[in-house]
Amino acid sequence: MTMLRVRSRDGLERVSVDGPHITVSQLKTLIQDQLQIPIHNQTLSTNRNLLLAKSPSDFLAFTDMADPNLRISSLNLAHGSMVYLAYEGERTIRGGPAVTPAGSFGRKMTVEDLIARQMRVGRQEKAHCDSVSFDRDCANAFQHFVNESLAFAVKRGGFMYGNVSEDGQVEVNFIYEPPQQGMEDNLILMRDSEEEKRVDAIALGLGMRRVGFIFNQTVTQDKKEYTLSNVEVLLAAQLHAESELKEWVTAVVKLEINEDGGADVHFEPFQMSDMCVRLFKEGWFETEIGPEDDPKLSKLKKEVVVGVKDVKEVDNDFFLVLVKILDHQGPLSCTFPIENRNTQTTMRALKTHMERARSLPFVKRISDFHLLLFVAQFLDVSSDVPALAECVRLQSHVPEGYELLIDSMANTS
């Protein structure tokens, strides 16, 4: 007897099959018999992204198991393999476990029990963010570093800054990379409050704000069966909750093997669901994660309801809401050395940058967030920094005092 693991919006379940010689049609019949999901409602795939599909029309994109006569052995499915299942409608569970009575004639219910029973975790169908568009230069600078310099061996992250339109479209125009320690399976931000004040002052002058967080996954994670790990969910939920911005975007950069055996870099933007952010704010997540914990499951301190079950572990995919991705050419360049990387930025770098762009108007030469952040160390954060950034936003004449200061800094190298 062969056992297949079936993951759906209700969590992880098991289906017993006669062996890998059965067809997709026979597998669907077994799922109907054992999990009570009608055959005509089922969509099966070996692609975990099926669980992120929002509507039946989205299910149509997953065709690897669409042929009812296909033998599952041809999909390399064997004992213990994972199959992803999406279905329409509700399901009826028969033969459920015995229930311990609660209330007046059974176990005494606490306030926490009542709250937990009301805390139902389901898939959020629609994001607050309609789409996210990345400035090509800043996105390329980030992915190039994690690909070429870090080889996707350790994690790297950055805060995304830009604008949010009235209809929920997010535009990312620069990425600030805070001090951090990246490891194979974790990312520790060593945030510098003074530096972040300068970043926010620049954003203010540019008419922008913090709109999200971006990080890469490492190559060792590519073999795991999750979209975000439990550690990544915790960090994403923390930063989303801190932002108080409902359109806040979490973007993941990953390396994936293409059909030709080569590697492609992919950007995947999400929003953490409202329920995920609420659970984090209210302290439901277990924050101590051990090496024996399953990375695709988030542990909670109390039970919540997922589908028809009371659970203390939730599939991370339940907390993710897909966001459409676009790109654009923003108003800033991205050629100045980026902060907090392997080498410290020096006055020599400023001189090289200014000389290389000497044919351009002065305001164009300084229209780079990373240059502005470097210069901001020597300016008043409450007045000079936003004033200089505003010149960049308006592409207006830069006051002579700022121009002289920047030129003198460059000439000290």
From Swiss-Prot:
Membrane-spanning ranges: none
Domain MPN stretches: 131-272
Keywords, in A-Z order: Phosphoprotein, Ubl conjugation pathway
The protein's annotated pathway: Protein degradation; proteasomal ubiquitin-dependent pathway
Phosphoprotein listed as a keyword: yes
Signal peptide start and end residues: none
Keyword presence, Protein biosynthesis: no
Gene Ontology biological process terms in this record: proteasome-mediated ubiquitin-dependent protein catabolic process
Modified-residue entries (Phosphoserine), positions: S104
Described function: May be part of a complex that binds ubiquitinated proteins and that is necessary for the export of misfolded proteins from the ER to the cytoplasm, where they are degraded by the proteasome.
Family: Belongs to the NPL4 family.
Protein name per its UniProtKB record: NPL4-like protein 1
Organism (species): Arabidopsis thaliana (Mouse-ear cress)
